[in-house]
Amino acid sequence: MGIECVGEVEKTTSSNLKKGQKIVSIMGEMGRAFDGSYAEYVLLPNEQVYPVNTSLSWEELATVPETYYTAFGSMGNLQIKENDNILVRVGSSGVGIAFLKLVKAKFPNIRIVASIRKKDIEKRNKILSLGYDEVIFDNNNILETEENFDKILELIGPVSIKDSFSHIKEYRIICATGLLGGKWFLEDFDPTRDIKNNAYLTTFYSGNVSEEKINSMLNYIEKYKIDVKTEKIFSLDEIVEAHKYLDSSSGFGKVIVINK
């Protein structure tokens, strides 16, 4: 497994890459069609190796793809304005937290609300400490609020998308990005009935990637001095522990694995 990695070029057949070049790679069937990034050396197709120019440390850079890339793309597709009222469904997720940091860095006074799926007061307080303005609860994929929003980042997926449409304002946007609800498809979906009239549905897929887009994101992070430090760091021989942590109730945000 391992669908993302950062590192330096050790050897290549590409004239566009040089030994020692700092690179990022995400998606492209890594960890599926061929071995992924859980290794000291990773063999990748040239076309999915993206050279980057950044002053971020290795720990910081490792935190960025694919989480920040997904959040950055979603932010662009949501066409964020400084007076927007935004909802992030599953605000404690890695993408949700990255999205919060990216948006708040540019619009510090914008209102961003997080939803969480368990009534966990400790997690609620931790989320608020990150900079969310309010936390609401998802009760079996139904939001426990009557509030409507200008923009919704939908990270749960098909199991909650119809409920999200009941909370979007007229002429505003939902970006369906995540599948944290564990369901990949939406059955019995009629766009003319299920998409709220005069509202918009878009999406972002992290497989839509290029060197230019990766570096645009990194430039944004450095321009706005965004703190991308991760929640927790594991070494390569602690991958099992890393997955156990993510699966536990204490799992929060994104963790990274470093080859020490």
Question: Where is each model-derived feature located?
Answer:
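Glycine-rich beta-strand-centered segment in the early N-terminal region that forms part
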Residues: M1-M30
